[in-house]
Curated annotation (Swiss-Prot):
Chemical reaction(s) catalysed: Ni(II)-pyridinium-3,5-bisthiocarboxylate mononucleotide = pyridinium-3,5-bisthiocarboxylate mononucleotide + Ni(2+)
HAMAP family for this protein: LarC
Native species: Moorella thermoacetica (strain ATCC 39073 / JCM 9320)
Keyword field contains Lyase: yes
Documented EC number(s): 4.99.1.12
Similarity section: Belongs to the LarC family.
GO terms for MF: lyase activity; nickel cation binding
Disulphide bridges: none
Pfam families (UniProt xref): Ni_insertion (PF01969)
Domain of life of the native organism: Bacteria
Protein name from the UniProt record: Pyridinium-3,5-bisthiocarboxylic acid mononucleotide nickel insertion protein
InterPro entries: Ni_insertion
Length: 396
């Protein structure tokens, strides 16, 4: 399994993330070509090699030319969904922007849908966020781990005047995640950086055991008494067994007084907050009323964010949670070519006690549905073609 460890000893921002990925071997041409699939005009990447305290690093800046419109969350999600980006990149990019908009909305006391991203800042954030996720995808990263995050201190100038560091939106994004104070009078973790790492990281902690393959540094723009760099380490975890045991939290609540039209939004927002799965179960309540048991599974570091989403988007007054163990397959995404077009598929591998390998294949439903509609073919035929092509892969 290919993993990426973000060592955020001096914080994280979108451009630092892009720089670290390029320093670790991400092709600038592949990155730029992929980002062109957004259909976004008036930008270019400036990449240069710099040194900070004698350490070589990659500096990335998004140059925006011409005027740009104000964009709300729906506009940005439309750009992402209508792009030619791979399905996993679309999904993760949308999740990051939803979390960023949710935090900005909390700061200003408005709904996430009302948050607008200012002209140049919107383009910069789009390229930073989508580019970072695309970069991880192109490098084949399957798991992201991050160090705890330094808060920084002082004040930062922004469109709304001087604000304390960390910026209010950053603090909302960092709820439920490990942070620590520093004496640096600078903004170390930006809202974009916070949205990226809290959405993408599977866990936070010390440097993991792995076979180290690449190390790269992404440069920050602020001059500090120490290297203002994001260190990215790439590596592989080799295990004698392919299955993995891990713990997750199970969060539950029973609801019998909510408009049923609100349940789909509750599910969507809970998943966007970091749940790995969520579902509804019909139950009979104590007074004989029909009700719904809402269950969500999430990593331990996502508890605060997922709980906040459930309280915000449901009528519940309390949650139960417990720690469960689960076995997970080694997973990866792949793209297979079918007579109808290219289809992304999810591959899972599990080794049973006798050593026999069990492989599960799941074509991405939404992609199959769109391809079937475009080709005028039955969905089941596109799905079957994707399964057949995936079985021919030597994916593991």
């Amino acid at each position: 399994m290919k993993i990426a460890y973000f060592d955020c000893f001096s914080g994280i921002s979108g451009d630092m993330c892009l720089g670290a990925l390029i320093a670790c071997g991400l092709s600038q041409d592949e990155l730029t070509s992929g980002l062109k699939g957004l259909g976004l005009e008036g930008w270019e990447l400036r990449v240069r090699e710099v040194k900070q305290h004698s350490i070589a690093a990659t500096d990335v800046a998004v140059q925006v030319t011409g005027s740009q419109p104000h964009r709300h969350l729906a506009d940005i999600l439309g750009l992402i969904n209508n792009s030619s980006l791979p399905a996993p990149v679309k999904e993760k990019s949308a999740a990051v922007f939803k979390n960023l908009a949710r935090a900005e909305g909390q700061v200003h006391g408005i709904d996430a849908s009302q948050v607008h991203f200012h002209e140049v800042g919107a383009v910069d954030a789009i390229i930073d966020i989508v580019g970072s996720i695309l970069g991880l995808h192109l490098l084949g990263i399957e798991k992201v781990i991050s160090s705890p995050l330094p808060a920084g201190s002082g004040w930062v100038d922004c469109r709304h005047g001087k604000l304390p560091v960390p910026a209010p939106a950053t603090l909302y994004l960092l709820q439920g995640y490990p942070v620590y104070g520093t004496e640096d009078k600078a903004e170390l973790v930006t809202p974009t950086g916070a949205a990226l790492i809290t959405t993408l990281a599977d866990s936070f902690g010390p440097f993991p055991a792995m076979n180290l393959t690449r190390v790269g540094f992404g440069a920050g723009k602020t001059e500090l008494p120490h290297p203002n760099l994001l260190r990215l380490a790439l590596g592989e975890i080799n295990s004698g067994q392919l299955e993995g045991e891990e713990s997750s939290l199970v969060i539950e609540t029973t609801i019998d007084d909510m408009n049923p039209e609100f349940f789909p939004a509750l599910l969507e927002e809970t998943m966007a907050a970091g749940a790995v799965d969520a579902f509804f179960t019909p139950v009979q309540m104590k007074k004989g009323r029909p009700g719904i048991l809402f269950t969500a599974l999430c990593p331990e570091n996502k508890l605060a964010a997922v709980a906040a989403a459930i309280f915000t988007h449901s009528s519940t007054l309390g949650l139960r949670f417990r720690r469960d163990q689960r076995l997970v397959c080694q997973r990866r995404m792949a793209e297979v070519v079918t007579p109808y077009g290219t289809v992304p598929v999810k591959l899972g591998l599990y080794r049973d006690p006798t050593g026999q390998v069990i492989t599960n294949i799941a074509p991405e439903y939404e992609s199959c549905r769109q391809i079937a509609k475009s080709a005028g073919a039955p969905l089941k035929e596109v799905y079957a073609a994707a399964l057949a092509a995936a079985r021919a892969l030597k994916a593991f």
